[in-house]
Amino acid sequence: MQIVATNKKIRDYEILETYEAGIELKGTEVKSLRERNVSFKDAFCRVRDNEIYMLNLHISPYKFANRFNHDPERPRKLLLHKREIKRLIGKLTTTGLTLIPTKIYFNDHGLAKVEIALVRGKKRYDKREEIKRKEINRKIKTYLKYGE
């Protein structure tokens, strides 16, 4: 598995569930992905006509594609099983939940996949608590390792 990109903003969310989905891509998008020219900035998923689309994912134009290049921020359809889509639609009707892509990778068969997560936004105090907890754990580990 070759990881192309990971979403750094996922730290701001509480992950409830993760799903693996295929992405409907054009040829120049695949070539650009292989060169790791992708940005997750403000990327999210939406339901439209009982299908899930990923919006605001920026895949840079392939530099050798000339006039046949793709639109860098076009909506991309995610390929999931019907039962997964129905389950996600049911959960997304709950307030405060959203779908966010966490990473894009090529699997062992060379197919582009995206891992999406059903998430709930963390509050500011939750983020501070998590930072404090990590800092305390780090201090404990150094104390156990060095003794003082």
Swiss-Prot record:
It is found in: Cytoplasm. CDD domains: SmpB (cd09294). GO terms for biological process: trans-translation. One of its GO terms (molecular function) is RNA binding. InterPro entries: SmpB (IPR023620), SsrA-bd_prot (IPR000037), SsrA-bd_prot_CS (IPR020081). PANTHER family: SSRA-BINDING PROTEIN, TMRNA-BINDING COMPONENT OF TRANS-TRANSLATION TAGGING COMPLEX. Required for rescue of stalled ribosomes mediated by trans-translation. Binds to transfer-messenger RNA (tmRNA), required for stable association of tmRNA with ribosomes. tmRNA and SmpB together mimic tRNA shape, replacing the anticodon stem-loop with SmpB. tmRNA is encoded by the ssrA gene; the 2 termini fold to resemble tRNA(Ala) and it encodes a 'tag peptide', a short internal open reading frame. During trans-translation Ala-aminoacylated tmRNA acts like a tRNA, entering the A-site of stalled ribosomes, displacing the stalled mRNA. This is SsrA-binding protein. It comes from Pseudothermotoga lettingae (strain ATCC BAA-301 / DSM 14385 / NBRC 107922 / TMO). The gene is smpB.
